[in-house]
Amino acid sequence: MTELRNVEAELSRFRARVLVAGLAVLCAFSLLAARLVYLQVYRHADLSERAESNRTAIMPIVPNRGLIMDRNGIILASNYSAYTLEITPSKVENLDETIAALQPLVEITSRDKRRFRRLREESKSFESLPIRTRLTDQEVARFAAQRFRFPGVELKARLFRSYPYGELAGHVVGYIGRINQTEKDAIEENDDEGNYRGTDYIGKLGIEQSFEAQLHGITGVEQMETSAAGRAVRRLASNPATPGETVMLSLDIGLQKLVEDMFGTRRGALVALNPKTGEVLAFVSKPAFDPNLFVDGIDQESWQALNESIDKPLLNRALRGTYPPGSTYKPFMAMAALQTGVRSSKVLINDPGFYMFGGRRFGSPENERGGIMDMHRAIVESSNVYFYSLANELGVEAIHDFMAPLGFGQITGIDINGEVRGILPNQDWKRHYFKRPEQQRWFAGETISLGIGQGYNSFTMLQLAQATATLANNGIRHKPHLAMATQNPLTQAIQPLPADPPVDLGYSPENVAIVRKALVGVTQEGTSTKVFAGAPYLSGGKTGTAQAVTIGQKEKYNKARMEERQRDHAVYMAFAPADNPTIALAVIVENAGWGAGVAAPIARRVFDYVLLGKYPSEEDMLAVQKGVAIAPIGQPRLVSDMMAQLIAGNAAMKQPAAEAAAPAASAASAAAAAASVCQGCLRVVPVTLKKRQSRSSGSVR
């Protein structure tokens, strides 16, 4: 009986254990089933999306940057594609060892390493950074064969910007560079991060900066299937990028080259405008720089050479260099007298070679005695005494109020950034400019110097050119602009850029005629007669000599005894043809002396180019560069021939090892269309476009 009870007890315990185990298994399976239902039903959509995202990746498609062209369709900025070797620091265990291992496959210079270190300091560790750009085909092949050895290192096809004419118009075209933190913040503020995904570059200067929105394009996206290692396997879907628009400039690159060549190694600036439209035909600052240096990130040596150069090649003298206008100010002083009624053109003033005011003697060059002067003769012969007395009669406030609407000391609003205001002085300006009370008072004697464009006067060549164009256009002022139109790269549709309405300053036609006649007299019987001898057209102009340093009352200017950078600047303002001007300009050659001897010859060759289609002979070009030219010498060359050489020379340059990204057909189409939007075009040079493969101020007073 005892054994039977024990067996029954064991069986009872066993059944209890089986029941507990069964219940435990049932609970476990219930929990698993519940979890399965939860994952498969309630979380199905979310988990499916996560799984799909692990299998696929959304990649940005960087748009082709738009082209930049001159008024005749010549390409000034384009793109080409090339392979770049890039490293993502967060995916590499030892950067130094990786770079060392790469060097037998790909040439990596010390400059490449320095740039990589700088980019790494400026960027986040998960961003891919270029260690070498523009790989050769052989380097691409060598790395591709060894790619498995280098996790975190990739070959990427990138678009690169190219400026085929180098320094030519570099200050106008500008350049692109890597996006810095300030620019990233601005992009985020504008909610434009999506459009810059996959993009490392942005316009930094010139047209590249001002028209960034048009040139950049719209970033596309593509959905890619990826492997477990995260590499793209195949494209699942795509929304293509929209290329940037082509920006068409009013600039004539042939004229630009002519002027830059005439400057040679000298410093200075020239701005040429169409007075009827405000289009900028030439915008020269010398010396210049090559924007190609900045595309990949300029190296330290090149940066120091540019930034520390005494000649300041990075300074856009046409936009930011300020100078006294010298005697080129006199025609505008004459207009002020006529328009305000302070003095008529027939009033006679005796010029004994000096002007006495407040016990101080204001002299003329070499104390020349001009004799009896009316307004016409005073402009033609550039009488200082006449305009000393006129400034005294007008007073500083009247001078200021008349000159401001002409654009002197004002921002013109040209369509590139960085313009400076300069100084158009009056009593209020002096009170704000100087801190010490005894310096804030305006003295009557300070007004006298303003009459001949000296004293506190300090303007840009852009302002002087705009004022000259306004006078040439009968007192109607146009806003200067470099860009004329944009072209859609897909539809080829051209959209002219809206221009500000012209401003009529209300000048009397009779008064304008008096001053313009005197300016024509300067070229026919005055200070620039020899320079314009033999010209088959009439032009108006005014020579000027602007002081770089102030000469004491009892001192005499002696060029031979002065340091080169203390010598006077040569200035000239002009327009042509005289009866119906289509071009107006202002030019300065720093520390070169008399305007008639150095600056006016440059203007003459510009007019011959625009009006006659003539390019200086080699001997004439050399004479201009040396500052000894007067009228042209030798057999002039044809502009069309020189343009053909310019384009052929560019095509023969060493090209990058890649095809141009911009289609040749698009470039040719834009070139053909360029002339149709050149309102007021002076001429269109016939060219055939070929597919391209790849000092804070200008002076110290």
Regions found by a protein language model. Give the residues of each.
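Periplasmic/cell-envelope proteins involved in peptidoglycan metabolism and beta-lactam response
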Residues: 1-302, 310, 322, 347, ...
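Beta-lactam-recognizing serine transpeptidase/beta-lactamase-like catalytic domain environment
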Residues: 2-6, 225-238, 275-328, 332-586, ...
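Structured catalytic/translocation cores of nucleotide/phosphate-coupled proteins
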Residues: 41, 69, 515, 586-587
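Cofactor-binding loop segments of dinucleotide-utilizing enzymes, especially the Rossmann-like FAD-
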Residues: 177, 381, 590
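Intrinsically disordered, low-complexity charged/polar segments
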Residues: 493-498, 622-636
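C-terminal soluble interaction/assembly domains
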Residues: 586-589, 602
